[in-house]
Curated annotation (Swiss-Prot):
Organism of derivation: Pithecopus azureus
Compartments where found: Secreted
Signal sequence bounds: none
Residue spans crossing the bilayer: none
Residue numbers bearing the Lysine amide modification: K12
Family, per entry: Belongs to the frog skin active peptide (FSAP) family. Hyposin subfamily.
Recorded superkingdom: Eukaryota
Gene Ontology terms: cellular component: extracellular region
Lineage, top ranks: Eukaryota, Metazoa, Chordata, Craniata, Vertebrata
Protein name in the entry: Hyposin-H4
UniProt keywords, alphabetically: Amidation, Amphibian defense peptide, Antibiotic, Antimicrobial, Secreted
Function of the protein: Has antimicrobial activity.
Keyword field contains Nuclease: no
Major subcellular site: secreted
Tissue: Expressed by the skin glands.
Length: 12
């Protein structure tokens, strides 16, 4: 997964 995707998943 892309770093941006990981950040969005953790941000939720």
């Amino acid at each position: 997964l892309r770093p941006a995707v990981i950040v969005r998943t953790k941000g939720k």
